[in-house]
C-alpha cells in the first residue's frame, strides 16, 4: 500500500510527517494514512511513508517489512474451461459446389405458426439447425413463409416429404427443398410486393421455379436465351427483364421465372395475380409469351393463352414455366404447331412420348419433327399435351430433347409443364427450337439450349426432376422446381390449381383467367384445365404421357375447367388435346405435320402475335368449355381442336366424336385456316396476339392474318385466321369475330348456354355433350360454311363435325368464338396440320419474342377491351332490343287492345317482355356466373344468350305449378332466367287472367274475337287452350311471327330476325336462324305447300303456323329463325293458321298470314328470343295457364295455371292469326290478352275446373264465338295440328317420345304438306294434321290416314275445306324436306323437329334438327323401332343428324307398331275425346297402360288426335305417374329434347296447342299419354286442365311435372256452346273437333266423319270442354263433350335440349332412364348416322332424380321468387285461395298449440292465468319502469313501508281463483307489498314456463323486472303473487332499485278498504290469442291482452 502510487496516497504534504525537518529531508515515494480521525475518534492522523516511516512516532505502528500483494491469492487458482465453437461453414452466394439440400422453405403457413411451433414440427424429421419465419419488413405481418435449415439432408427431405401439402393449423402448407432459399426469396418478393397474399402465393409455379437451383443461373440462362432469341423472353428462367411479357409485369422476375422456369409459371403460371398476365389482362398470354417470349411460343400459346390466358397461362405457365424445357418447348411447340403440336404432340406423346422417359428420346424425335412440319405439329401437340401434361411427368423429359425444342420442348416441356403451353413453342422451334436458347442450333442446339436452359437455367433443377415427368406432378415439380422442389412445386401447383383455379378467373385473360387460377393452382391448374381434357385425353391421346397427368390434371382441370365461359378456349386447346387424342396418332404424321408446320410457322408468328397463347388458352378455354362439360372430349379433341381452336367448343360439343375425330377435325380445320394463314401468319403475329389474346373478340378479325397461326392456337382469332387456314372458313370466321365473343356462339350457346346456365353445376358428360352438340349441330344443319364442315367432316366426321358445326354456328354466334375460343370453329383450326407453318422461322423470331410479347400484351389488352366492349355492347343490345321488342309487343298489344277489349293478353304479353328484361338480367347474371367478363364469363359465345337461357329450363318447370296458383306464375318459376322471365310474363298473364277471370271470360270472347280474330272470335276452342295458344302466341306469336316472317324471308329476314334473336338469344338465335335459313329453304317449299295461296310471307307464316301448330309450325319457324323464332313462328303461325281457319271464315287468312308475317317480323326480335326462352317458357306457361281455364278446374292451381298459360298461348296465337291485319304483334298481344281472358275464367274456376273449362270456353265462344269455337277446333286442331307439335311434344314426353319424333315429324311433314293447300294449309294442318301426323308419324300408314281424316275435317285456310288440309297432312314431305326439323320439333314436338327449333339453341339445334339428335329419333322410321316416327318425318330421316337418344323418339313407338303405337303420342286425346274418337284404340292402351299406351296410342292417334289424347290426359296427370313409367319413358327422351330446345319450340306448341304445350316438355306429353292410357281419362279428360298443368309440370319437372301440363290440353275443350260451333267456320270446327280430340265416336279412320261431326259439333266440342266434368265422369262421352285433345306445342330444339340436360339440375328418374335406354337402343337399331350414337355406350346409372313431380309446387305455400332470391323480389301478394289455405291451417295450429301447450311460451294464452308469465311480467315491468317516480321517493317509500307491513290475506277471489285482500285500510300511494320470488333470467323463465305448463300449473306468476330478469313467484314468493288483474285496479306495480337491486313493489293507487281485493293491471302486451278478463269492472277491456 505504501508502494501505491502517490495518487493513491495523498501526496504527503511534507509538513505533516513527523519532524518537520525529517519530513523535509526525506522525499517519500508514497504514503498511507494509517489513522483517520474521522474514522477513529480521538486519534490523530497517522501517515506512513514508504511503508517505513510514520508521521507520528508511535511504537504501536511497525513498518512494513515485506511488500506483497494484499489480495487473496486463492481466487486465481481456479481454471475455467473456455469452449471456442468451431465456426460453421457458411453456404452463401460464393459457395462453390453442390449445395446440400438441407434448407426447407415453408409457404402458406398459418400466421399463428411461430418459430417454436415450426421447430417442434420439424425436429421429428431430424435435427433443426435454424428456424426463421419471414415477416413483412414494413408491416411486420406474418408472411406465411418460413426457412428451416436441417442438420442433415435426409431430415430436410423427410420433412418435405411428410409435411408438404399437409394441413397445419387449418392451412395446407407448401413445403419444398429450397437449397439456396431462392424460392423463399421469390415468395418473399411476391408477398412483400403485394402481388400475392400468403394464401394466394403461387407456390406451385414458384416451386417449379424454385427448383431451379439459382435464380441467377436462371437469369443468366434467360439472358442467354434472350440473346439467343430462343425463348429467352418467354423461357429465360432468370431473364426476368428479358421476357418481354415479363417486362409488363412488376415481377419481371416472375416473367423471368416464366422464362427461366417455364415449368413454374411463377407469377403467371403460379397464378401470381400480378404476373398472371404480365401487365395486360391478357398478360397471361403475354406472360405466356413472356414465359415463352418468342412469338412462336406466344403464338402457340396465344390462342390458348390469350384466349385461355387464364387456363392456358396457368397450365402453360405452371407446366410450361415449371418445365424449363417447357419454356423453350413452348416456343417449339408453338412454332411447331400450336394445334398440330398439340394434336401431333399429343399423338407423339401418346405414341412416342407415352412415358416420361420415352419423351426424352421422343422429344428429340419430336423436336426433329417439330422442325419439320410434322414434328412441329407433334411438338405442338406435345406442347399442348404438355400443357395438360404438366402433371404428367413426360413433359420434363421432353425438354431434354431441346435439340428439337419445338417437338421436344413442346412435347416434353409442354407435356410436362402444360399441354397447352407446350404447343406455343412450336412456332419458335423452327427458328429457335429451344425456348431457352433461341439461336443455338435450331435443331440440335435448341434442344440442348432449351434443355440447358431448362436444365441449365431452371432445368438444371427442373431437369434433374425431369425424369419425374412420368409422375406428372413430380415431373412438373422436379422439372420446374428442381429435384426437390419440383415435386412439391407440382403438388403445390396442382393443389393451387385445384384450390385457386376457380378463384382466379382472369376472365378476360382467357388463359390468364384460367392460367391465373391455374397459375395459382400452379401449372397443374393450367395443366389441369387441359389435363382435365388431357386426363381423358391423356388416356386416349397421350396414353403414356397423358395418362399420368390427366388424373392429376383433372382435378386442377376441374377447378379450372369449371370456368364455363372460358371453356371454349380451353376446349380449344383441350380439344386439341382431345382431338389430338384421336388424331394424335394419325394427325401427328399427316395432318398434324402440315398443321405442325403451319402451326409452327404460324404459331411462331402468332406466337409473336400471341396466337400461341390464344391457342393454348383458347384450347384451354375451349376445352374448358367442352372440357368442363366433357373433359374427356376435350382431351380427345384437343389435338384436332387445336387446329380448330375456334372449333374447340364445337368439338367439345361433340367430344365423343370429337375425341376420335377431333384429330381429323384439327387437321382439316387447321388446314383450312393454317395453310393460307400460317405462312402469312408470321407477318401478322402481333395482331394475332390480340386475337389469341382475345380470340373471341371480334376485334380479332383484323388480326385474322396473324390469327391463322393463332387460328391453331386461338380459336376465336382464327375467325379472321380462317381465311388463311381455309378460305371458306374465313367468311365464317370473320362473321364469327363480328359477333360478340360470348354473344353469338350458337354452338356455344347451345352447349354452354343450354348447359352453361347449368354447366357450372352440371358438368356435361362427354356423351352428354356429344349428344347435345350432335343434336344441336345437327339441328343447325351442316355448318353454314361448308369449309369448316368439310374440314370438320374430314377431320372427324362426328367430333369434328360437331365442332365444325359450332363454328358454322359460330359465325352467327360469334359468341362461341368470342367468349372463349369461342368459335366453335373447329373449322378454324389453330393451325393447319396440312399446311406446315412457314418453317420454324417463328422460332427464330424468338429474338423478337420480347417485342412480340409486348405487342401481344397490348393486343391482348385491346382484345380484352374489345371483347369486353363487345360483350357489354351485346348485352346492352340484347337488353335494348329486348326492351324494344317489349315495347313493340306492348304497342302491338295496345293496338290489339284497342281492337279487342280484352287486355289480359296485353298484361301477359307485357309480362313476357318482362321476361326479356329478366333475360337481360339473366344474361348479366349468367355473365357474372360466367366467372368474369371474358369469354368464359360470357359462356364463350353462348355467352349471354346461352347463359341467360339455361336458367329458363328450371323456370319452366316451376311455372306450371305457379300458373296453378292464381297469380303466382311468376313466383312459380323463379329460376328460369330467360325462360323464366317468359314464363313469368306468362304467369303474369295468367295472373291477369286469374285476376279478371270473369272479365276475361266475358270479355275474352270479344277480345278474342276482336283481338285474335278480328273477323272471327277466337279460334280458341276453349278459352283455355286457345287462350293458352294465344298466350303462347303473344309470347311466341312475336317470336313465331318473327320466325314466320323470318321463315318467309329467311335469307333476308333471317338477318334481322337473327339480329333481334341475337339480342334475345344472340347465339342460340343465330344458330337457329342459320338453321332456319337452311330449314327455311326447306320450309319455304313447305310453306308454299302449306299455304300456297298465302303471300310468300303470309303463306309461310300461315303455313308455318299450320305446320308449326301441327308440325310445320315448328319446322317453319325453325327454318326461318331457329328454335326460338321457329317456336314463336310455330305458335304464331300455328295460331295464325287456326285463326286463319277462323279467319278464313272471316276472310282473314290473308291478313292473318300477313299479320303473322309482320308480327313475325316485329315480334320476332323480341319474341323470337323471348319466344325461344319466353316462348318455350311463356308459351308453355301460357298454354298451361290459358288451358287452365279449361282444365284448371281439374288441376285447380297448377294445372289451372298451366292451362291458362296454354290457353292464353293458344288464344294469343289465334288472336295473332285473326288480328294479323291489325298487326301480327298486336294480335299476338291480343292473343296473349285473350288467353288471359279465357285464362281468367279458367283460373276463376280453378276450384271448378270443369266449370271453368266450360265457362271459359263458353265465354270465349260467346264473346268470340268463332274464335272460341275455332278454339275448340284449334285446341283440337291446334292440339291436333298445332298439337301435332304438342303431341309430338307429348311425344317427347310420352307421346312425343314415341310419336313426337316420328309421328309428329310425320305429322309435321304432313302438316307442312298440308299447308300446301293454301286454305287448308294453316288450319287444316293444325286441325287435321295434328292427329294424323302423330299417327302418320308413328305408323306412317296409319298416321297418314288419320291425318287425312283430320285434315279434311279442318282445312286451316278455309273452314269449309278442312279435309283437304288433312289429306295434305300425309304429305308431310315438307317436314321431310327439313332434315333439321326434327319430327318432334316440327310435329307435335316442335322439339323433336326442334332441330329447327334447336337452331335457336346455339349449337344444338342443327344437330337435333339435322337428323340424328332429335330428328334421327323421329326421322328414322323404323317400324319396330321407337324412332320409327322419324321416318314419318322425312326431314328428320333425311337429316341424319345425330339425335339425342331421348330427344325425339317416342320410346314406346318403337315397340308399338310404328303405324299404331307411334301414334300413341298423338293419341293423347282427351279421355273423353279419345273414347269418343279413338277411345278404343288409343285411350285404352295409352291411358290404361303406361308402356303399352304408346303402342295403342299410336293406333288411336289416327282416330284420336294427340290433342284428344292430351285432352284426356289432363286428368291423367295423376295417373300419369303410374303410366309415366311406361309412357313416361318417352318423356325422358323428350326431356332430353327439353335441353335441346324444348322450351323454345314448345312455345310454338303452346301457341298452337296451348294445352298441349306443357306435354311437349317431354314427360309432360308422355304423362298426358299416360293419362290417356287410363281411358278414364274421360275423367282425366276434364282434367284436360290437368294435362296442361301436367304438361307444364312435366316440362318443368321431368316426369312428375307432366301431370300439371296436362291441364293445358283441356283448355281448348272449354269452347262452350254450339253457338261457337255455329260461329266458327267449318275449318274452325274441324280444328276444334280434332282439338276436341275427335270425338270418341270417330276413329282415325273415321276422322273424316269426325271432322264432319266436328263441324256439326264444333259448338258441342267447345262444350265438351264444358262437359269436361262429364268427360271426366264419362270419358266416352260424345265427341262434343270430350274436350278437344290439347295438342302440346312441340318443344323447340332448345327446349328439348334444356329439358334433356335439365337432368343435370333435377336429375333423371328411373322412368327417364328406362326410356332413354329404350330410345338409345332404338337409335342404335335405326342407326341414323348419328356419330355421337356410335360414341355413346349405355351404362347403367342409378336415377339421380332429386325431386318427385313438381305437380303443385305452389301448394307448399312457399312461393319461389321469380329471381330465385327473396331479397331481390320483396314479397308477392298472396292469393286469397293460398292465404285461406295456410291461414286456416295456421290458425288451427295456432289455436291448438295454445291448447296443447298452455305452458309453452304462452302459458296464459288459453286462459289469462295460463298466459306466459314472463311476457306478462315483462310488460308490467316496462310499465313499472315507465312510472318513473323519483327513485328516492320510491326507495324511501319502500324502506318506510317495509318497516310497516300491510296486513294482507289471500282468499278465494271472485275474479279468479285466489286473490289478495287487505286486512286493513291502505292509504293511497302506499306500498302494499313487494312482489317477491326467484330472480331468474329470461331463458330460465322460458324453460320454467314450459315446465310449469307440463306440470299443469296453469297460472303464471312470473313478473318481469326488466329486459333481462324476471321474478318467478310460482313456487316461492309471497302473497303478492295472488294479486289478480283488474281493468280498474286499486294498485299499481312499480320497479324500484334498492341497493342496486331492482324490486317490484305494489303501491296502492287509491284508498283501499278492509277486505278489498288488491288488484293491479297486468298490462299484458296485445296478442292475437286473447286472455279473457274476469275482473268484471265497469270499464273492463274484456281481455288481459
Swiss-Prot record:
GO biological process: methylation
Compositionally biased residues, Polar residues: 242-258, 264-273, 281-304, 353-365
Upper classification of the organism: Eukaryota, Metazoa, Chordata, Craniata, Vertebrata
Family membership noted in the UniProt record: Belongs to the class V-like SAM-binding methyltransferase superfamily.
Gene designation per UniProt: Setd1b
Extent of Basic residues compositional bias: 1-11, 1535-1544
Species of provenance: Mus musculus
WDR5 interaction motif (WIN), short sequence motif: residues: 1764-1769
Chain residue ranges for the region called Interaction with WDR82: 67-97
Protein residues bound to S-adenosyl-L-methionine: 1962
EC number: 2.1.1.364
Name listed for the protein in its UniProt record: Histone-lysine N-methyltransferase SETD1B
Catalytic activity: L-lysyl(4)-[histone H3] + S-adenosyl-L-methionine = N(6)-methyl-L-lysyl(4)-[histone H3] + S-adenosyl-L-homocysteine + H(+); N(6)-methyl-L-lysyl(4)-[histone H3] + S-adenosyl-L-methionine = N(6),N(6)-dimethyl-L-lysyl(4)-[histone H3] + S-adenosyl-L-homocysteine + H(+); N(6),N(6)-dimethyl-L-lysyl(4)-[histone H3] + S-adenosyl-L-methionine = N(6),N(6),N(6)-trimethyl-L-lysyl(4)-[histone H3] + S-adenosyl-L-homocysteine + H(+)
Description of the deletion phenotype: Mutant embryos show growth retardation from 7.5 dpc and die before 11.5 dpc.
Location(s), subcellular: Nucleus; Nucleus speckle; Chromosome; Cytoplasm
Main location: nucleus
Stated role: Histone methyltransferase that catalyzes methyl group transfer from S-adenosyl-L-methionine to the epsilon-amino group of 'Lys-4' of histone H3 (H3K4) via a non-processive mechanism. Part of chromatin remodeling machinery, forms H3K4me1, H3K4me2 and H3K4me3 methylation marks at active chromatin sites where transcription and DNA repair take place. Plays an essential role in regulating the transcriptional programming of multipotent hematopoietic progenitor cells and lymphoid lineage specification during hematopoiesis.
SMART domains: N-SET (SM01291), PostSET (SM00508), RRM (SM00360), SET (SM00317)
Amino acid at each position: 500500500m505504501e508502494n501505491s502510487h502517490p495518487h493513491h496516497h495523498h501526496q504527503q504534504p511534507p509538513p505533516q510527517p513527523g519532524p518537520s525537518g525529517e519530513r523535509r529531508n526525506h522525499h517519500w515515494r508514497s504514503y498511507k494514512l494509517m489513522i483517520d480521525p474521522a474514522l477513529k475518534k480521538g486519534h490523530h492522523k497517522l501517515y506512513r511513508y514508504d511503508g517505513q516511516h510514520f508521521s507520528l512516532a508511535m511504537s504501536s505502528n511497525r513498518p512494513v517489512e515485506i511488500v506483497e500483494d494484499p489480495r487473496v491469492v486463492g481466487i486465481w487458482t481456479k481454471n475455467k474451461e473456455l469452449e471456442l465453437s468451431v465456426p460453421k461453414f457458411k453456404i452463401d452466394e460464393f459457395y462453390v459446389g453442390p449445395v446440400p439440400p438441407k434448407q426447407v422453405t415453408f409457404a402458406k403457413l398459418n400466421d399463428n405458426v411461430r418459430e417454436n411451433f415450426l421447430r417442434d414440427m420439424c425436429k421429428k424429421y431430424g435435427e433443426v439447425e435454424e428456424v426463421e419465419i419471414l415477416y413483412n419488413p414494413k408491416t411486420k405481418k406474418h408472411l406465411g413463409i418460413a426457412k428451416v435449415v436441417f442438420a442433415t439432408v435426409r431430415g430436410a427431405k423427410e420433412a418435405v416429404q411428410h409435411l408438404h401439402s399437409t394441413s397445419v393449423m387449418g392451412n395446407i402448407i407448401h413445403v419444398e427443398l429450397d437449397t439456396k432459399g431462392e424460392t423463399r426469396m421469390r415468395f418473399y418478393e411476391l408477398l412483400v410486393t403485394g402481388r400475392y397474399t400468403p394464401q394466394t402465393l403461387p407456390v406451385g409455379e414458384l416451386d417449379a421455379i424454385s427448383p431451379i437451383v439459382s435464380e441467377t443461373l436462371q437469369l443468366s440462362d434467360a439472358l442467354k436465351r434472350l440473346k439467343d432469341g430462343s425463348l429467352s423472353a418467354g423461357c429465360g428462367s432468370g431473364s426476368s427483364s428479358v421476357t418481354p411479357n415479363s417486362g409488363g409485369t412488376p415481377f419481371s422476375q416472375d416473367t423471368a421465372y416464366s422464362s427461366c422456369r417455364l415449368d413454374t409459371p411463377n407469377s403467371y403460371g403460379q397464378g401470381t395475380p400480378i404476373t398472371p398476365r404480365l401487365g395486360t389482362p391478357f398478360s397471361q398470354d403475354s406472360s405466356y409469351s413472356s414465359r415463352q417470349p418468342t412469338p412462336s411460343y406466344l403464338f402457340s400459346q396465344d390462342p390458348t393463352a390469350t384466349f385461355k390466358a387464364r387456363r392456358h397461362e396457368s397450365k402453360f405457365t405452371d407446366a410450361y414455366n415449371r418445365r424449363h424445357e417447357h419454356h423453350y418447348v413452348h416456343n417449339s411447340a408453338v412454332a411447331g404447331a400450336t394445334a398440330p403440336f398439340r394434336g401431333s404432340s399429343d399423338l407423339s406423346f401418346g405414341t412416342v412420348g407415352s412415358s416420361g422417359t420415352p419423351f426424352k428420346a421422343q422429344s428429340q424425335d419430336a423436336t426433329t419433327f417439330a422442325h419439320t412440319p410434322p414434328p412441329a405439329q407433334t411438338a405442338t401437340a406435345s406442347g399442348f399435351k404438355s400443357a395438360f401434361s404438366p402433371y404428367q411427368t413426360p413433359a420434363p423429359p421432353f425438354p431434354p430433347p431441346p435439340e428439337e425444342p419445338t417437338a421436344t420442348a413442346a412435347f416434353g416441356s409442354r407435356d410436362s409443364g402444360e399441354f397447352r403451353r407446350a404447343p406455343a413453342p412450336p412456332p419458335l422451334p423452327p427458328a429457335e427450337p429451344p425456348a431457352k436458347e433461341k439461336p443455338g442450333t435450331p435443331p440440335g442446339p435448341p434442344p440442348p439450349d432449351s434443355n440447358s436452359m431448362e436444365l441449365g437455367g431452371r432445368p438444371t433443377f427442373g431437369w434433374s426432376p425431369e425424369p419425374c415427368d412420368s409422375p406428372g406432378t413430380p415431373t412438373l415439380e422436379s422439372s420446374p422446381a428442381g429435384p426437390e422442389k419440383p415435386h412439391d412445386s407440382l403438388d403445390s401447383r396442382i393443389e393451387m390449381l385445384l384450390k385457386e383455379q376457380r378463384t382466379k378467373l382472369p376472365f378476360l385473360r382467357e388463359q390468364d383467367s384460367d392460367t391465373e387460377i391455374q397459375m395459382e393452382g400452379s401449372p397443374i391448374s393450367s395443366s389441369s384445365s387441359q389435363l382435365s381434357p388431357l386426363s381423358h385425353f391423356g388416356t386416349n391421346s397421350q396414353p403414356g404421357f397423358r395418362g399420368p397427368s390427366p388424373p392429376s390434371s383433372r382435378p386442377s382441370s376441374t377447378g379450372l375447367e369449371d370456368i364455363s365461359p372460358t371453356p371454349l378456349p380451353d376446349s380449344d386447346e383441350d380439344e386439341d388435346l382431345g382431338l389430338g387424342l384421336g388424331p394424335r396418332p394419325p394427325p401427328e404424321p399427316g395432318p398434324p405435320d402440315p398443321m405442325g408446320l403451319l402451326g409452327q410457322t404460324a404459331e411462331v408468328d402468332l406466337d409473336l402475335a400471341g396466337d400461341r397463347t390464344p391457342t393454348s388458352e383458347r384450347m384451354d378455354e375451349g376445352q374448358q368449355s367442352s372440357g368442363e362439360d366433357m373433359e374427356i372430349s376435350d382431351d380427345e379433341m384437343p389435338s384436332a381442336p387445336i387446329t380448330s381452336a375456334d372449333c374447340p367448343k364445337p368439338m367439345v360439343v361433340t367430344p365423343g366424336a370429337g375425341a376420335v375425330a377431333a384429330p381429323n377435325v384439327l387437321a382439316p380445320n387447321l388446314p383450312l385456316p393454317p395453310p393460307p394463314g400460317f405462312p402469312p401468319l408470321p407477318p401478322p403475329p402481333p395482331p394475332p396476339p390480340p386475337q389469341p389474346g382475345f380470340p373471341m373478340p371480334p376485334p380479332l378479325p383484323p388480326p385474322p392474318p396473324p390469327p391463322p397461326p393463332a387460328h391453331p392456337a386461338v380459336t376465336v382469332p382464327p375467325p379472321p385466321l380462317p381465311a388463311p387456314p381455309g378460305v371458306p372458313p374465313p367468311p365464317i370466321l370473320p362473321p364469327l369475330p363480328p359477333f360478340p365473343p360470348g354473344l353469338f356462339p350458337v354452338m356455344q350457346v347451345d352447349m354452354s348456354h343450354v348447359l352453361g346456365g347449368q354447366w357450372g353445376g352440371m358438368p356435361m358428360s362427354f356423351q352428354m355433350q356429344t349428344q347435345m352438340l350432335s343434336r344441336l349441330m345437327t339441328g343447325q344443319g351442316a355448318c353454314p360454311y361448308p369449309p369448316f364442315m368439310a374440314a370438320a367432316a374430314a377431320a372427324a366426321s362426328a367430333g369434328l363435325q360437331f365442332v365444325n358445326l359450332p363454328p358454322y354456328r359460330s359465325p352467327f354466334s360469334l359468341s362461341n368464338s368470342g367468349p372463349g375460343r369461342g368459335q366453335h370453329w373447329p373449322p378454324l383450326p389453330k393451325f393447319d396440320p396440312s399446311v406446315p407453318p412457314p418453317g420454324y422461322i417463328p422460332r427464330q423470331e424468338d429474338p423478337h419474342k420480347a417485342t412480340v410479347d409486348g405487342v401481344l400484351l397490348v393486343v391482348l389488352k385491346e382484345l380484352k377491351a374489345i371483347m369486353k366492349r363487345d360483350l357489354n355492347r351485346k348485352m346492352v343490345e340484347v337488353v335494348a332490343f329486348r326492351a324494344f321488342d317489349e315495347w313493340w309487343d306492348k304497342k302491338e298489344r295496345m293496338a290489339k287492345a284497342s281492337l279487342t277489349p280484352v287486355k289480359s293478353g296485353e298484361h301477359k304479353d307485357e309480362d313476357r317482355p318482362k321476361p326479356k328484361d329478366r333475360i337481360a338480367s339473366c344474361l348479366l347474371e349468367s355473365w357474372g356466373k360466367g366467372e368474369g367478363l371474358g369469354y368464359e364469363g360470357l359462356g364463350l359465345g353462348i355467352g349471354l344468350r346461352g347463359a341467360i337461357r339455361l336458367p329458363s329450363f328450371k323456370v319452366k318447370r316451376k311455372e306450371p305449378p305457379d300458373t296453378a296458383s292464381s297469380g303466382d306464375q311468376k313466383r312459380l318459376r323463379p329460376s328460369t332466367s330467360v325462360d323464366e322471365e317468359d314464363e313469368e310474363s306468362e304467369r303474369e298473364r295468367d295472373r291477369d287472367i286469374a285476376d279478371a277471370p270473369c272479365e276475361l271470360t266475358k270479355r275474352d270472347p270479344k277480345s278474342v274475337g276482336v283481338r285474335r280474330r278480328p273477323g272471327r272470335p277466337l279460334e280458341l276452342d276453349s278459352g283455355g287452350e286457345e287462350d293458352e295458344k294465344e298466350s303462347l302466341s303473344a309470347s311466341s306469336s312475336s317470336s313465331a311471327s318473327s320466325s314466320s316472317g323470318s321463315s318467309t324471308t329467311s335469307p333476308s329476314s333471317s338477318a334481322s330476325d337473327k339480329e333481334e334473336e341475337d339480342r334475345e338469344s344472340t347465339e342460340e338465335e343465330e344458330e337457329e336462324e342459320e338453321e332456319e335459313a337452311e330449314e327455311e329453304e326447306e320450309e319455304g317449299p313447305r310453306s308454299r305447300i302449306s299455304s300456297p295461296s298465302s303471300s310468300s310471307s303470309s303463306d309461310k307464316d300461315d303455313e308455318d303456323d299450320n305446320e308449326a301448330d301441327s308440325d310445320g309450325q315448328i319446322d317453319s319457324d325453325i327454318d326461318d329463325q331457329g328454335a326460338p323464332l321457329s317456336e314463336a313462328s310455330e305458335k304464331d303461325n300455328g295460331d295464325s293458321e287456326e285463326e286463319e281457319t277462323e279467319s278464313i271464315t272471316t276472310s282473314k287468312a290473308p291478313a292473318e298470314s300477313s299479320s303473322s308475317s309482320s308480327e313475325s317480323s316485329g315480334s320476332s326480335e323480341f319474341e323470337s328470343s323471348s319466344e325461344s326462352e319466353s316462348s318455350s317458357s311463356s308459351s308453355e306457361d301460357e298454354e298451361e295457364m290459358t288451358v287452365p281455364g279449361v282444365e284448371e278446374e281439374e288441376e285447380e292451381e297448377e294445372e289451372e295455371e298451366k292451362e291458362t298459360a296454354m290457353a292464353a298461348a293458344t288464344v294469343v296465337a289465334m288472336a295473332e292469326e285473326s288480328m294479323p291485319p291489325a298487326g301480327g304483334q298486336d294480335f299476338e298481344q291480343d292473343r296473349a290478352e285473350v288467353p288471359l281472358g279465357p285464362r281468367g275464367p279458367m283460373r276463376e274456376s280453378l276450384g271448378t275446373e270443369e266449370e271453368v273449362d266450360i265457362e271459359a270456353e263458353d265465354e270465349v265462344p260467346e264473346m268470340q264465338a268463332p274464335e272460341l269455337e275455332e278454339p275448340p277446333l284449334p285446341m283440337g286442331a291446334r292440339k291436333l295440328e298445332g298439337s301435332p307439335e304438342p303431341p309430338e311434344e307429348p311425344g317427347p314426353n310420352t307421346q312425343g317420345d314415341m310419336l313426337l319424333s316420328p309421328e309428329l315429324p310425320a305429322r309435321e311433314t304432313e302438316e307442312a304438306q298440308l299447308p300446301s293447300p293454301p286454305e287448308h294449309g294453316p288450319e287444316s294442318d293444325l286441325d287435321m294434321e295434328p292427329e294424323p301426323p302423330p299417327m302418320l308419324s308413328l305408323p306412317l300408314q296409319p298416321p297418314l290416314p288419320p291425318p287425312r281424316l283430320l285434315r279434311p275435317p279442318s282445312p286451316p285456310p278455309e273452314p269449309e275445306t278442312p279435309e283437304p288440309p288433312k289429306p295434305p297432312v300425309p304429305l308431310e314431305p315438307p317436314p321431310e324436306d327439313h332434315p333439321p326439323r326434327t319430327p318432334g320439333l316440327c310435329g307435335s314436338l316442335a322439339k323433336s323437329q326442334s332441330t329447327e327449333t334447336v337452331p335457336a339453341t346455339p349449337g344444338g339445334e342443327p344437330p337435333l334438327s339435322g337428323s340424328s339428335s332429335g330428328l334421327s329419333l323421329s326421322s328414322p322410321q323404323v317400324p319396330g323401332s321407337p324412332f320409327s316416327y322419324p321416318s314419318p318425318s322425312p326431314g328428320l330421316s333425311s337429316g341424319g343428324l345425330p339425335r339425342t337418344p331421348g330427344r325425339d323418339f317416342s320410346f314406346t313407338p318403337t315397340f308399338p307398331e310404328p303405324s299404331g303405337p307411334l301414334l300413341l303420342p298423338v293419341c293423347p286425346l282427351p279421355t273423353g275425346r279419345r273414347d269418343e274418337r279413338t277411345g278404343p284404340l288409343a285411350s285404352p292402351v295409352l291411358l290404361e297402360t303406361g308402356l303399352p299406351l304408346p303402342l295403342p296410342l299410336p293406333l288411336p292417334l289416327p282416330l284420336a288426335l294427340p290433342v284428344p289424347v292430351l285432352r284426356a290426359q289432363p286428368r291423367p296427370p295423376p295417373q300419369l305417374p303410374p303410366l309415366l313409367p311406361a309412357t313416361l319413358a318417352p318423356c325422358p327422351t323428350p326431356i332430353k329434347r327439353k335441353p335441346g330446345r324444348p322450351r323454345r319450340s314448345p312455345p310454338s306448341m303452346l301457341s298452337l296447342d296451348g294445352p298441349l304445350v306443357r306435354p311437349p316438355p317431354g314427360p309432360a306429353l308422355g304423362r298426358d299419354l299416360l293419362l290417356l292410357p287410363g281411358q278414364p281419362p274421360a275423367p282425366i279428360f276434364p282434367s284436360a286442365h290437368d294435362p296442361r298443368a301436367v304438361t307444364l309440370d312435366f316440362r318443368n319437372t321431368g316426369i312428375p311435372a307432366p301431370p300439371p301440363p296436362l291441364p293445358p290440353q283441356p283448355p281448348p275443350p272449354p269452347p262452350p256452346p254450339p253457338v261457337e260451333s255455329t260461329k266458327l267456320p267449318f275449318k274452325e270446327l274441324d280444328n276444334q273437333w280434332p282439338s276436341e280430340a275427335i270425338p270418341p265416336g270417330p276413329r282415325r279412320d273415321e276422322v273424316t266423319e269426325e271432322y264432319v261431326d266436328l263441324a256439326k259439333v264444333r259448338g258441342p266440342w267447345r262444350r265438351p270442354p264444358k262437359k269436361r266434368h262429364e268427360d271426366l265422369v264419362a270419358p266416352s262421352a260424345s265427341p262434343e263433350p270430350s274436350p278437344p285433345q290439347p295438342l302440346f306445342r312441340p318443344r323447340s330444339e332448345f327446349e328439348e335440349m334444356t329439358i334433356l340436360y335439365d337432368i343435370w339440375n333435377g336429375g333423371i328418374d328411373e322412368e327417364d332412364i328406362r326410356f332413354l335406354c329404350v330410345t338409345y337402343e332404338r337409335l342404335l337399331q335405326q342407326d341414323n348416322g348419328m356419330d355421337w350414337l356410335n360414341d355413346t355406350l349405355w351404362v347403367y346409372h342409378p336415377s339421380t332424380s332429386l325431386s318427385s313431380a313438381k305437380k303443385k309446387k305452389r301448394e307448399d305455400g312457399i312461393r319461389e321468387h321469380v329471381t330465385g332470391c327473396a331479397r331481390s323480389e320483396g314479397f308477392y301478394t298472396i292469393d286469397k285461395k293460398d292465404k285461406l289455405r295456410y291461414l286456416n291451417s295456421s290458425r288451427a295450429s295456432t289455436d291448438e298449440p295454445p291448447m296443447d301447450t298452455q305452458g309453452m311460451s304462452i302459458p296464459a294464452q288459453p286462459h289469462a292465468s295460463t298466459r306466459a308469465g314472463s311476457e306478462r311480467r315483462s310488460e308490467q315491468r316496462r310499465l313499472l319502469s315507465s312510472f318513473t317516480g323519483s327513485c328516492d321517493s320510491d326507495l324511501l317509500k319502500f324502506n318506510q313501508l317495509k318497516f310497516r307491513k300491510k296486513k294482507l290475506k289471500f282468499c278465494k277471489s271472485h275474479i279468479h281463483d285466489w286473490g289478495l285482500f287487505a286486512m286493513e285500510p291502505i292509504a293511497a300511494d302506499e306500498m302494499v307489498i313487494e312482489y317477491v320470488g326467484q330472480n331468474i333470467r329470461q331463458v330460465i323463465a322460458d324453460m320454467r314456463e314450459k315446465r310449469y305448463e307440463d306440470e299443469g300449473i296453469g297460472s303464471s306468476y312470473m313478473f318481469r323486472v326488466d329486459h333481462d330478469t324476471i321474478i318467478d313467484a310460482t313456487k316461492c314468493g309471497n302473497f303478492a303473487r295472488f294479486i289478480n288483474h283488474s281493468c280498474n285496479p286499486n294498485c299499481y306495480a312499480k320497479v324500484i332499485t334498492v341497493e342496486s337491486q331492482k324490486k317490484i313493489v305494489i303501491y296502492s293507487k287509491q284508498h283501499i278498504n278492509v277486505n278489498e281485493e288488491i288488484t293491479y293491471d297486468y298490462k299484458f302486451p296485445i296478442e292475437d290469442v286473447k286472455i279473457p278478463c274476469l275482473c268484471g269492472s265497469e270499464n273492463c277491456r274484456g281481455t288481459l291482452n
